[in-house]
Amino acid sequence: MMKRLTVTLLMMALSAGIVLAQPKAKAADATKTAAPANAAVDELKQIENDWADASKAKNADKLGEILADSWVALGWDGKTTTKAKVLADTKTAGNSLDTFEMGPMKVRIFGTTAIVTGSDTEKSMEDGKDTSGKYVWTDVFVKQNGKWRAVASQSTKLPK
C-alpha cells in the first residue's frame, strides 16, 4: 500500500513539475500559435488512436515509437509498468486487446509537454485474466527531437 502511494505521489509530482516548468505563453503568442496548437492536438489524438491500434495488433515496433524509453505507467491494478514490459507482453499469449472503443479525449499542451485525458471501453486480457471494462486514463507526452513521445501514463478501471 505504501509503495503504491509513493509511486502515485511520485507520478503526480513528476507531472506537476513538468507542467510548472514550462514558460507561460503571452496573450499575443496564443493567437499566433493557435493553428500549430490545433495541429498538435490532432496529432496527439492520432497518436492515442495509433497506440490502441498497435496494442490490438501486438505491434511492438509501433509501440516502441510511441513510448519513450523512460515511459512508466501506473496501471488500473496499482502496478507499475515499463516500456520493456509492454513490448515483451506483445509476445505473450495471455495478453490481448480484442476490442477498443475510444471515448472523448481532452488535450492540453504546455510548450513541449502535453497531457491527454480520455476514456475507453475495451475487451481485454492480462496474464490470462479478463480485464475488460471501461477505463479513464491520463497520458503525459514530451516532444523529443520533433516527435511526441509518451513518458508517463495512469489508468483507472471504472466499477461496473
Where are these regions (language model features)?
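N-terminal export/membrane-targeting signals
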Residues: 1-22
